[in-house]
């Protein structure tokens, strides 16, 4: 691991792919790229633990529903916000991707089918069942759920291993010679070299 907070000057790194952010998505993507044989540079804005100065980079205003300050609810260190995450996993529903007149800026550039095909690959990364649970699955298992004609029963799944993306759970990345992990590496600009 390279900690830019301990290096006085600029350094040069080479890799086929640069992944920005060592949270759940960045770590999962890095693992996949390594499995495919790529050389990866994984950049993390923070260090290995919470630092107020780095957290301050997230300062901003939240709008809409009352919620925690951004610098307290979006963490910049290895493992990202999963450090305060309860493991609750909710997949998007088809309507979440659709354009709705009553929701400003709604509508995704991809459809539900495009997103859904990736959920099957993502679920095992969090120790979740290979397919999305349905109310019928719970009823078959003996859970007494009410029957609704018009309402859908929302189900949540939980990752019971809360530290899945913490530094101590990522020894595979540190040990892989094709992976360069760089901390205190806040990205402020990018340039294509292709």
Role assignments for model-derived ranges:
Residues 1-17, 35-36:
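Extreme N-terminal leader/targeting segments of oxidoreductases
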Residues 2-4, 189-194:
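Conserved beta-strand-loop-beta-strand element in the redox core of flavoprotein oxidoreductases
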Residues 15-42:
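N-terminal Rossmann-like FAD-binding beta1-loop-alpha1 element of flavoenzymes
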Residues 23-24, 46-48, 186:
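Glycine-/small-residue-rich beta->alpha transition segments that form the dinucleotide
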Residues 34-56:
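Glycine-rich FAD pyrophosphate-binding loop
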Residues 60-135:
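Redox-cofactor-proximal catalytic regions of oxidoreductases
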Residues 101-104, 108-192:
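Conserved redox-cofactor binding core of oxidoreductases
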């Amino acid at each position: 691991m390279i900690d830019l907070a301990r290096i006085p000057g600029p350094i040069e790194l080479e890799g086929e792919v640069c992944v920005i952010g060592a949270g759940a998505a960045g770590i999962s993507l890095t693992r996949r790229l390594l499995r495919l044989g790529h050389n990866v540079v994984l950049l993390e804005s923070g260090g290995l633990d919470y630092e107020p100065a780095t957290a301050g980079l997230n300062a901003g205003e939240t709008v809409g529903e009352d919620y925690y300050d951004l610098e307290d609810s979006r963490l910049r260190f290895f493992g990202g916000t999963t450090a305060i995450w309860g493991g609750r996993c909710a997949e998007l529903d088809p309507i979440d991707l659709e354009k709705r007149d009553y929701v400003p800026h709604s509508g995704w550039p991809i459809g539900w089918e495009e997103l859904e095909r990736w959920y099957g690959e993502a679920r095992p990364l969090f120790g979740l069942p290979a397919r999305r649970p349905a109310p019928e699955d719970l009823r078959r298992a003996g859970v007494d759920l009410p029957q609704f004609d018009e309402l859908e029963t929302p189900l949540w799944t939980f990752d019971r291993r809360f530290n899945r993306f913490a530094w101590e759970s990522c020894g595979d990345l540190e040990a892989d010679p094709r992976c360069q992990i760089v901390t205190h590496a806040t990205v402020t600009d990018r340039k294509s070299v292709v």
